[in-house]
Amino acid sequence: MNLIQTLEKEQFDKLSAGKTIPEFGPGDTVIVNVKVVEGERSRVQAYEGVCIGRSGGGINESFTVRKISYGEGVERVFPLLSPMIDSIKVVRRGKVRRAKLYYLRNLRGKSARIVEKKQDRPAKVAAGAAE
């Protein structure tokens, strides 16, 4: 491991020490709680939308969230380890076959919906229901 990788690993561990970042990817609906500073006051603002892509890696990783606000599409890019992010919560998992969902920018209404990923039930529960 070279010097740059060692320094990035130290910074990554330092920044992600107090945070729990859930596993999520493109197509997942997430709620990002962002710290907003207005003058001397600071508050937490929830930003809910569909993750349309993740980029970068390690300390430079970021993700893009898209939502429709008052009929207008709004996209926001968040650095994953930003101190301005209070928490990230996954609301639902989306079933997609692409890493970047930029095609959603051109879709409106029902065509812009993403199918929810169905979770398989464990075999024991299915076998118990059959008896």
From Swiss-Prot:
Pfam families named among the record's database cross-references: Ribosomal_L19
UniProt keyword terms in alphabetical order: Ribonucleoprotein, Ribosomal protein
Keyword Ribosomal protein tagged: yes
A GO BP entry: translation
KW NADP (keyword) present: no
Annotated GO MF terms: structural constituent of ribosome
InterPro entries: Ribosomal_bL19, Ribosomal_bL19_CS, Ribosomal_bL19_sf, Translation_prot_SH3-like_sf
SUPFAM superfamilies: Translation proteins SH3-like domain
UniProt xrefs under Gene3D superfamilies: 2.30.30.790
PROSITE patterns the record matches: RIBOSOMAL_L19
A GO CC term assigned to this protein in UniProt: cytosolic large ribosomal subunit
Job of this protein: This protein is located at the 30S-50S ribosomal subunit interface and may play a role in the structure and function of the aminoacyl-tRNA binding site.
PANTHER family reported for this sequence: LARGE RIBOSOMAL SUBUNIT PROTEIN BL19M (PTHR15680:SF9), RIBOSOMAL PROTEIN L19 (PTHR15680)
Family: Belongs to the bacterial ribosomal protein bL19 family.
Protein name: Large ribosomal subunit protein bL19
The organism of origin for this protein: Rhodopseudomonas palustris (strain HaA2)
Designated gene of the protein: rplS
